[in-house]
């Protein structure tokens, strides 16, 4: 162990406290970032970095009388000995203030895949009601000809995205459109959309009816929010994209404009740009600006909103919105469905984390909607590290270990050496 520590301590690493002109230049480039003629990133409104004092923000009034959040719990893919992949996902919706009837509603989707086509799931793909109609479940079977690789991942994606989207659509009638809706994770089913937009001979879901139905569900969800002008955000807890950094690094090499770009991901870049001592470009109040270094542990720092294009599909797909399928129906202009986001850095257990907050360009292109959506998220993060209603939804939707073991006991699980060495663990 001493040798391991010695190797680690010998790695040269520097974290410059002072903000260099290069870092400032990086941020300024985010105002409009192109790859050739293609626009990749564009600031919506003014480019800025700012902060709020969490202590003051938590004492302010919430502009929204009710907040909704959705989440889906999963067994995660289970491989059984006769080649059957199975994943069961359980979706729920939470509200603050609490709405017990809404919390009681549940949607369960089970997806199966067997490459030999021998294992058939019971029943049909129609909904089966339970709990006096407050719950419903259905099964999806992926055709064996569609997948040569990524079977476990696809079984999971079908289950989690279907359960989430179907449950949101089912509970929209219970929503007060003057409220605020927080989705767990990105706005759209990113993994599924990638493969729907890729000409792959090994993952042939592009024209699969179930994949199309899932994507149509998400477009229908966004139509509801655009029609009612009801704010919706995707709260991405662990953003890991590299689209912006890849382009910046390419430009740095071609145009010789940066000596060094040390970040591996977009999140690392935003984390550096949002260090508390750097994130005051005039947006903070006079009282907040006077908090000084001693108050940095209470500072929540954030950027302006950005329009982010070309993040879902390969270059052979020309659209920049999720409307890759011509058969998808939608009520608004394609650009309105494009994802916009802002980054926010939050103090967290003697360190800090960066969250990505997504919304629809069709909503946040309105300045007042941008302001209200930003303020709502800052208020939620000042009151707790994760929005309260999102934590509620996570608790309601979670599938416990006992339930997972009960499912496993119905079949013979295919165990590898790692199963015996580490026990039951999740691997997608």
Spans of features found by a protein language model:
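N-terminal functional modules and adjacent low-complexity/disordered segments of proteins
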Residues: 2, 90-92, 142
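Long, contiguous domain-sized segments
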Residues: 2-54, 60-61, 66, 149-180, ...
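Two-metal-ion RNase H-like nuclease active-site motif
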Residues: 66-76
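Generic enzyme active-site microenvironment
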Residues: 70, 91, 182
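Active-site cofactor/substrate anionic-group-binding motifs, chiefly glycine-
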Residues: 74-81, 86-109
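Compact, glycine/acidic-enriched structural inserts
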Residues: 95-151, 155-156
């Amino acid at each position: 162990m001493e040798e391991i520590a010695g190797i680690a301590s010998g790695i040269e690493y520097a974290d410059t406290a002072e903000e260099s002109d290069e870092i400032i230049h990086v941020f300024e480039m985010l105002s409009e970032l192109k790859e050739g003629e293609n626009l990749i990133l564009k600031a919506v409104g003014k480019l800025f970095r700012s902060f709020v004092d969490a202590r003051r923000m938590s004492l302010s009034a919430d502009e929204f009388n009710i907040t909704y959040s959705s989440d889906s719990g999963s067994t995660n893919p289970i491989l059984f000995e006769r080649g059957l992949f199975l994943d069961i996902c359980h979706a729920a919706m939470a509200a603050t203030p609490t709405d017990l009837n809404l919390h009681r509603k549940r949607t369960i989707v089970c997806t199966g895949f067997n490459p030999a086509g021998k294992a058939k799931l019971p029943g049909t793909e129609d909904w089966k009601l339970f709990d006096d109609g407050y719950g419903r479940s259905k099964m999806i079977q992926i055709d064996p000809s569609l997948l040569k690789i990524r079977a476990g991942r696809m079984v999971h994606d079908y289950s989690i995205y279907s359960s989430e989207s179907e449950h949101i659509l089912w509970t929209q009638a219970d929503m007060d459109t003057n409220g605020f809706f927080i989705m767990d994770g990105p706005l759209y089913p990113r993994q599924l959309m990638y493969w729907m937009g890729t000409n792959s001979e090994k993952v042939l879901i592009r024209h699969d009816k179930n994949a199309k139905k899932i994507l149509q569900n998400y477009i229908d969800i966004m139509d509801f929010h655009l029609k009612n002008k009801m704010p919706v955000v995707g709260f991405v807890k662990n953003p890991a994209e590299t689209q912006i950094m890849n382009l910046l690094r390419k430009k740095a090499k071609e145009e010789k404009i940066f000596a060094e770009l040390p970040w591996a991901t977009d999140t690392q870049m935003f984390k550096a740009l949002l260090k508390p001592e750097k994130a005051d470009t005039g947006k903070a109040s006079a009282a907040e600006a006077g908090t000084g270094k001693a108050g940095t542990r209470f500072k929540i720092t954030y950027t302006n909103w950005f329009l982010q294009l070309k993040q879902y599909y390969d270059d052979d797909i020309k659209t920049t919105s999720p409307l890759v399928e011509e058969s998808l129906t939608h009520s608004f202009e394609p650009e309105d469905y494009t994802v916009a986001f802002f980054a926010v850095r939050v103090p967290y257990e003697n360190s800090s984390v960066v969250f990505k907050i997504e919304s629809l360009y069709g909503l946040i292109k309105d300045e007042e909607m941008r302001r209200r959506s930003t303020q709502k998220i800052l208020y939620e993060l000042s009151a707790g590290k994760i929005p309260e209603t999102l934590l509620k939804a996570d608790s309601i939707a979670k599938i416990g270990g006992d339930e997972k073991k009960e499912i496993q006991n119905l079949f013979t699980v295919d165990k590898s050496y790692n199963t015996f060495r580490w026990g039951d663990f999740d691997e997608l």
